[in-house]
Amino acid sequence: MVNYVLRKMLGTKNERELKRLRPLVARVSELEPRMKALSDADFPRLTAEWKQQVRNGRPLDDLMPEAFALVREAGVRALGMRHFDVQLIGGAVLHSGRIAEMKTGEGKTLVATLPSVLNALSGRGVHVVTVNDYLARRDSEWMGRLYRFCGLTTGVIVHGLTDRERQDAYHSDITYGQNNEFGFDYLRDNMKFRLQDYVQGELNFAIVDEVDSILIDEARTPLIISGPSDESSDLYYRVNQVIPSMIRDQDFTVDEKSRTIVMSDSGVEKMEKKLGVQNLYDPNAIETLHHVEQALRAHHLYRNEVDYVVKNGEVLIVDEFTGRLMPGRRWSDGLHQAVEAKEGVKIEAENQTLATISFQNYFRMYSKLAGMTGTADTEAEEFAKTYNLDVVVVPTNKKNVRKDSEDVVYKTEREKFGALCDEIETRHKKGQPVLVGTVSVAKSEVVSSLLKRRGVPHDVLNAKHHQREAEIVAQAGRKGSVTISTNMAGRGTDIILGGNAEMMAKHEVGPEPDLPMEGEAEESFLARKQEWARRLEETRERLRGQTATEHDEVVALGGLHIVGTERHESRRIDNQLRGRAGRQGDPGSSIFYLSLEDELMRIFGSERIQGLMSRMGMKEGEQIEHPWLTKAIEGAQKKVEGHNFDIRKNLLEYDDVMNQQRRSVYRLRRMVLGFGAGVPVVEYDEEPKTRKKTRREQVFTWGDQREHVLDLIEDLVFDMVGASCPNRLSDWNLDGLSSMVKEQFGVEMKFAPPSGKAADARREIEEQVYAVVEKAYRQKEEELGIGPDGEPVLRRYEQWLYLQAIDQQWKDHLLSMDHLRQGIGLRGYGQKDPKQEYKKEGYEMFVQMTWRVKSAVIGNLLRLQLVRQETAEEIEQKRLAAQRRAMQRITETHAAAAGDGEEKPRPKQETVVRTQPKVGRNDPCPCGSGKKYKKCHGATEAAV
C-alpha cells in the first residue's frame, strides 16, 4: 500500500528517470538553430576541437547537449533523418551505461549515433555490437555517412577479415561488428606473439544492439577456440552403429526439459555386449561411455532441420535464436562428431580447448557497457545482477495501435496448420501483408508446402535462404505479400508498409561496381560507378511514388498482420515477432495459433492446459480462445525462462572461476610481450562490488624483464628450500634439495648439516642457492653477448621461452579444468557443494600451473645451448612462424548449450593436486587483483 501511494505521488522509477532527462532534450532543441547555421566544414572542425578539450580533461557529460545537437543536424544533412526527442532520451540512456528499451521501428540504429559520436571524442574507441555480419556492414555504411560528416572514421568487423583489416577497423573512431567476432578477436589476440599483432585494442565503450538476444539468450553458449587433438574417429562410427538397437524408455530415458539422457541397467549391459567392453564405468572405459552418451544425445535430442542442417556433406548448426546457419561453428565435447556419425558425413577431428570465454565475462570487461532492444524490461533483474545494467523504457514517438488477439489453441498440429493457412489465405486475398513466424526451419518448410498446395505465393526466410534476407524483409510490408520467417529477432530491417523503396531500388539496379574489370581504364570504371549511382537515384524516385500509394492502401487494409505458428520458449521472442507490426503509429495486428502437440506445450505445459481444455468440453477440430489459456501458456514460458536463467547463472558461476585465472594469465602474457616493446600495456583494475574499472598503462623495459626473471628464480628457490627444509631440523632432506637444485637449475650444490634455529638456517640456504643460480644466470647472459640493439641477446630468448611455457601450460590447464568440470557434479553425491569444490580444486590446479610455468622458463633458460648465434630478427621470425602455425589449426566454436547434459567424469589424464599449494611471491595473485601474490593473498596467508 505504501509503495502504491509513493508511486502515485512520485511516479515510477522509470517515469522519474524520463523526467530527469527532459531538460537535456530542451537544451538540445535550444541549440538547434545554432547548429543549422553551421557550414558543412564546421562539423569536423568542431569535432576536432572537442576531442582536444576531452584530452585536456573536459568531461564528456559536459559536452553532451552540444554533441547531441551537432549529431541531430548531421543526421539531417548526411542522411535526411532528424533525431526525434525520444531518440535523444535513448541516446542519453546509452551514454550513461544503461539499456534503452525502444520498440521496433523507433530508430535504434539512428539512436546509437548520439552516444557513439560523444564517446568517440575520448579517442579510445566505441564498439557497436550487432547480431550478424549483414547488419554490421549495413549500419557501418549507412551511419558511416553521418560519422564522416562529423569528421569521424568508421570500421566494420565481420567474418573473413585479415588481421591487418581488423586492426584498421579497430583503429577507427567507431567500430561496428558481430558479437562473436568481438569475442573471438579478444581470444585470438591473447594467443599472439607480438603486441603489435593485437587487433582489438581497448575495451572502452560498447553499445549492444538486440542486447537481450546477445547478453541473455546467447549467454548460455561460451565462445571456444580449439585445436585438433590426436583422437581417432573410429570409436564414433562404432558407437553410432549400435545406437539404433537401443530402445527408448527401456534401455534409456530422455528428459527433454533438461536435455539429458540416462541409460538403464539393461541399456548399459546391451552397450557393453555390443561394444565388447567388460564394464562401461571402469576408469579405463570412461571415454567409451562418454561416446555412447553423446551418440544418444545426437540421435534423440538433436534434430536435422531444427538444430542443424546437412549441407554439402557438412553438419551446420542452426542458431536457435535467429534461425541462421553458423558455418565454421561446432558443438564441443564430441557432440558434433556424434552428429556427423549419425548423418553419415565425414567426421572432423575432435578439438582441444585452447581459449574460451563466456559472453557475460567478455562484455563485463568493457569500461562502459550499454544496450538497446525492443524487449528488455522483462529481464531487468538479470541485467542488473549479471551486468550491473539498469533498464530504462523509452516512450514511443507515436502511440502503438496494434491489435494483439488472444492465442487460438487446437488439440493437434494438423488442425492448427489447417486453421492458420485458412487465416493466411483469407488475409492474402484481401491484399493485407502477412508475416508468419515459426520456431524452426522444419516448421517453416511445413507451412510453405501447405501454402504452395493452396496456390498462395510467399517468400521463405530461414537458415536455408538467408542470402536474400534483407530483400525479403524489406518487401514483407507490400500489398498481398506473405513472408514466412523462422525467427524475426534481430533481423534488423524495418518492415515498411507499402514496401521499402531504398531496398527495392538496390535490388532492381543491382550491386554497386566495386572493382575495375580486367583491362578496364580508371576513367571507364569511374564512369560506370557514376552511371550506377544515377540509375539508383532515378529508380529510387520512381519507386517512392509507387510505395507511397501502396502504403495508404495497406493502412486501409489494417496494416501488417502477424501470425505466430507456435509460442517460442521466450516471451521476448514472441514480443519481438509481434513488434514487427504497428511501427511508428502504423496499424497492425497479431495472433498466435497453437496446439497441444507444440514442443513448448508438450514439454512444459501440456497436462495443465489439457485439463483446462477437457473441462471446457473441447472436441476434435474445435478451437478455443480464453484469457485463462493465455495465462497458462505464459506460465509454461516462464518455466522455460526460469530454467534457462538457471543454466546461464550456473555457467557464469563456473566461468567466474576460469575468468579470474584467464585474466591473470592474459595479464602476465601481455606483460611478457610488453618487455622491450616500447609501447604502453593497458590494463584495467576492477573494484569487485561496484565493478568500477580504473585504467592504468605501463611501459615495460628489457631491464624490467631481467628483474622479473630474477624474481622467478627467487620464487623457485624459496619453494624448493621450503619443501626440503621444514620447521623441524630433523625432517630436513638436504640430499633431496641438492637433487632438486641440480634438476631445476643444472648446478651442483652440497649443503653442510644445519645448526642453530631452523628459520635462520633455512634463510641462509636460500641465499646460498639464489647466489649460485643468479651467478649461472649472469654467466649465460655473458655467454650469449650483446645484440645489435645494445641489449643482451638472452632477453629475446627469455621472452620466447616464457611465452612458450605460458601457452603450453595454459592449454594443459584448460584440459585439466575441462575434466574437473565434467566430473565435479558427482561431488554432490558425497554431500559436497560441486561449485565450491570446483573453485577450491581449480585454484590449487592454477597454482601448480603457475609453478610449472616458472620451472619451465628458468630450467630451459639455464640449459640453453646455441649451435649458432641467431639475430633478433631470426628469433622474431621463429615466433611469427609459430604463431601462424597455431592460428592455421584453430577452430572457433559455440559450445553446446551449457547444462545440456549431466556432468560425468571423463578423465583423459591424471592431474596431481598438491594439498598445500604455494604461489610464487612475485606471481600475479590468482584472485585477479593484478597485485603480486606477496602483496595480496600472500600477505594475508603469511599473517595467518
UniProtKB/Swiss-Prot annotation:
Keywords, in A-Z order = ATP-binding, Cell inner membrane, Cell membrane, Cytoplasm, Membrane, Metal-binding, Nucleotide-binding, Protein transport, Translocase, Translocation, Transport, Zinc
Give the domain of life: Bacteria
Q: What does the record note about the cofactor?
A: May bind 1 zinc ion per subunit.
A single GO BP term for this record reads: protein transport by the Sec complex
Q: Quickly give the catalysed reaction.
A: ATP + H2O + cellular proteinSide 1 = ADP + phosphate + cellular proteinSide 2
Pfam families, alphabetized: P-loop_SecA, SEC-C, SecA_DEAD, SecA_PP_bind, SecA_SW
Please give the residue ranges the record annotates as the region Disordered: 894-944
Q: Which GO terms describe its cellular component?
A: cell envelope Sec protein transport complex; cytosol; plasma membrane
Keyword hit for Flavoprotein:
no
Which residue stretches does the UniProt record annotate as biased composition, category Basic and acidic residues?
Answer: 901-911
Protein residues bound to ATP: Q87, G105, E106, G107, K108, T109, D494
Subunit field text: Monomer and homodimer. Part of the essential Sec protein translocation apparatus which comprises SecA, SecYEG and auxiliary proteins SecDF-YajC and YidC.
Q: Please give the NCBIfam families that the UniProt record associates with this protein.
A: PRK12904.1, secA
Recorded protein name is Protein translocase subunit SecA
Which species is this UniProt entry from?
Answer: Anaeromyxobacter sp. (strain Fw109-5)
